[in-house]
């Protein structure tokens, strides 16, 4: 397993009126953060808040290229970012405690924190398509370059983990500094992760380590036909 210390490139916040960052996503231009009863759009260049959507935003956030998805208690809300309207709701599995949320290859991936699980869900019905066991609390989920990553946070220890999307085996780990937690995880599609900072009210940008092309190909996990 590859292991490294996190390279924090920069951080934003705390933001006015924001006491906790619950989830993070990126729409290609703006970083969206879930802050309780609002979704705030942040300029990743300046860190300025550009706009807000009044919607329950209690945990993970995702973007499918057109719509935002936001965890609110026992459901996922599908939101039109242009109008701010909730246009559909998707039931979550029983159990509660959901955290990270990601969109990949036509399906939703949701973390269940204290149960240490990641679910792949049908975005129309909420049906569970796959369950992955984790060894740590799951506090954020993202996909990039065919790789499944999730955040963890227990006590003062937090890290980012690349895992096999079928077995949950940890393939790579990026350790955050002591006391710096991750609550929400998103990739920019390149070499950067956006990490929510929980009660710090901050968003941090962490560099995704580069790997040799041969090593990278050998250790990547890709989605199977069920998620395409």
Where are these regions (language model features)?
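A short beta-strand motif characteristic of beta-propeller blades
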Residues: 7-15, 48-53, 85-91, 127-132, ...
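Beta-rich, blade/repeat-based domains predominating
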Residues: 15-28, 55-65, 93-105, 135-146, ...
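Blade-level signature of beta-propeller repeat domains, shared across WD40, Kelch, NHL, RCC1
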Residues: 182-228
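Short loop/turn segments that connect beta-strands within beta-propeller blades
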Residues: 43-47, 80-84, 122-126, 164-168, ...
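Conserved beta-strand positions in repeat-built beta-propeller and related beta-rich domains
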Residues: 31-37, 70-74, 110-115, 150-155, ...
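Blade/loop signatures of beta-propeller domains
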Residues: 1-7
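WD40 beta-propeller blade core
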Residues: 40-41, 77, 119, 161, ...
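Beta-propeller domains
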Residues: 36-44
